[in-house]
Curated annotation (Swiss-Prot):
Pfam families, sorted: PEPcase_2
Cofactor annotation: Mg(2+)
Protein name per Swiss-Prot or TrEMBL: Phosphoenolpyruvate carboxylase
Enzyme's top EC category: lyase
Source organism of the structure: Sulfurisphaera tokodaii (strain DSM 16993 / JCM 10545 / NBRC 100140 / 7)
This enzyme's EC code(s): 4.1.1.31
Length: 511
């Protein structure tokens, strides 16, 4: 059995601080190659996700890694000891990126040839897995695998003229097949994960499977509680699929540093591992790596890599139904507030610092994200915008839990163990003064402000969550939030931008 990575370094632009080695505030181009190397060598992460989705991708990354750091990659073999995994555009959704999908897939055999030349022998394929975002149907997975086999590998046997074949011009094409990791990003797909993963296993009979569950985008689209419960439901179902088909499933989860996006950081990783039992691989995003002390980061990653993997937590049918109902109730309270705040969120998001060179995606779940009737920014800047105006998104919609029965509460607390811990971590950054300033500056509907106040009141009076923070961190963040909103009201954009960055540094993540 191959090694399955336990940590995956990603290019999510959630870092407030810029790493010392970066040539500019926006990490791009050659800096991302350096970043990939440092993820392996300095942080000792098992896997790097190379993102070809929504940005200018460098498909020559393997060539650059092998030529710039030959001694390291002779010791640590790509595809055996450490891994580089492409996140490809989904050609079904992202029309403008269809050819980028093709280009990225075509680069896989090139990486094989480079490794063959580098080692002077038949190598382990350095790249053999791809992540398919927004997977909603098992046939999409089969189509990607067949595309690689039919359109890329089989063309070596195409006859060009007389006895000259494609293989005679470009050589043999390897690897002959690849593996695919579905990335499940929407709530409906998580609740029907059997129809995606189960049907794929029935059709393709893989020896094992890695399944990637999003945690960040579902939070933005459906609210914190709905996102956590959707992932818990999906993990439970993956455990049942594993038993049913007798193949090992290795789940990945995409988690950021702040509670809304996963709460996975060097100070809280142990609780997150305990929360999401059965998960094999956790993402190590940019804020995790660059917004904490270096020794804290390295020690945390070492512990994550060395940990025991816990068993899946399986639910009975009634518990599954209750999770589904709570998720629906929560979302129906959360979404109208977000729709009403969309204008404010989009305006603030424009002034948060950019940390990656990204192209904008268009579409249902592209990088301009749609929830209900409005378009929102990326999840990172969405989260950062709400923190910046003193309304951590973790608390939006929370008063809907008042409708739960005692039994439903018990199921919720059993399946979201650290709910109060996460809410308390977020509630430190609530600022009533900023909420008042926001109301004045953008003329936000009074009814929406009332709903937000009901959520904060419920958190404080029913859940015993302390709102605001009397220590220096929370007070400083609240003060700077007010200053930022005053600067925006007066049209002092540069001043506001500096305040927004300062707040991000205080909370150790952009969003």
């Amino acid at each position: 059995m191959r090694k399955i990575p336990r940590t995956m370094s990603t290019q999510h632009p959630d870092n407030a601080r810029v790493p010392e080695w970066s040539r500019s505030e926006v990490i791009s181009g050659e800096s991302e190659v350096i970043e990939a190397y440092l993820a392996y060598e300095h942080y000792e992460v098992d896997e790097v996700m190379w993102d070809a989705e929504g940005k200018d991708v460098d498909t020559h990354v393997v060539r650059k890694l092998l030529t710039q750091y030959p001694e390291f990659f002779k010791e640590k073999i790509l595809g055996r000891d450490i891994f580089l995994t492409y996140r490809i555009p989904n050609p079904k959704i992202e029309g403008a990126e269809k050819k980028v999908f093709a280009e990225t897939m075509e680069s896989i055999p090139i990486t094989y040839d480079l490794a063959e030349k580098f080692f002077n022998t038949k190598p382990t394929p350095p790249v053999f897995e791809v992540i398919l975002p927004f997977t909603t149907d098992y046939k999409e997975l089969i189509a990607i695998l067949k595309y690689y086999e039919v359109a890329i590998v089989n063309k070596e046997n195409v006859k060009l003229v007389d006895d000259i074949y494609v293989k005679d011009l470009i050589g043999e094409i390897n690897p002959k097949s690849i593996e695919i990791i579905p990335l499940i990003e929407d709530r409906d797909s998580m609740f029907k994960i059997d129809q995606i993963v189960g049907e794929y296993i029935k059709a393709m009979k893989p020896p094992y499977m890695r399944v990637f569950l999003a945690r960040s985008d579902p939070a933005m689209n459906y609210g914190l509680i709905s996102a956590v419960l959707s992932v818990k439901y999906a993990l439970n179902r993956l455990g049942k699929i594993e038993k049913k088909y007798g193949i090992k499933i290795f789940p990945l989860i995409g988690v950021g540093s702040l509670p809304f996006r996963g709460h996975f950081n060097p100070m809280n990783f142990e609780k997150v591992i305990d929360e999401y039992r059965g998960v094999y691989t956790f993402t190590v995003q940019s804020a995790f790596k660059y917004d904490y002390e270096d020794n804290e980061v390295i020690n945390a990653i070492r512990k994550i890599n060395e940990r025991e993997i816990s068993e899946f937590e399986l639910l009975d049918e009634e518990e599954e139904k209750i999770l589904h109902r709570i998720a629906n109730v929560y979302t129906s309270s959360y979404q109208p507030i977000i729709e009403s705040l969309a204008d404010v969120i989009n305006k603030i998001a424009l002034f948060l610092p950019r940390r990656r060179a990204r192209k904008l995606h268009i579409g249902l779940f592209g990088y301009s994200r749609s929830t209900g009737k409005v378009t929102l920014p990326r999840a990172i800047t969405f989260t950062g915008a709400l923190y910046s105006i003193g309304i951590p998104p973790e608390l939006i919609g929370i008063s809907s839990l008042s409708t739960l029965t005692e039994k439903e509460w018990n199921v919720l607390e059993k399946n979201y163990k650290y709910i109060k811990h996460d809410l308390q971590a977020a509630a430190r950054f609530v600022s009533y003064e900023s909420i008042d300033l926001m109301k004045e500056t953008w003329n936000v509907n009074e009814e929406i402000i009332k709903k937000i106040m009901e959520d904060l009141s419920y958190a404080e009076n029913t859940l015993n969550i302390k709102i605001g923070d009397s220590n220096s961190v929370g007070r400083k963040h609240a003060l700077i939030s007010s200053l930022a909103l005053i600067a925006l009201k007066e049209g002092n954009i540069d001043e506001a931008k500096s305040y927004l960055l300062e707040m991000a540094k205080i909370r150790k993540s952009l969003g």
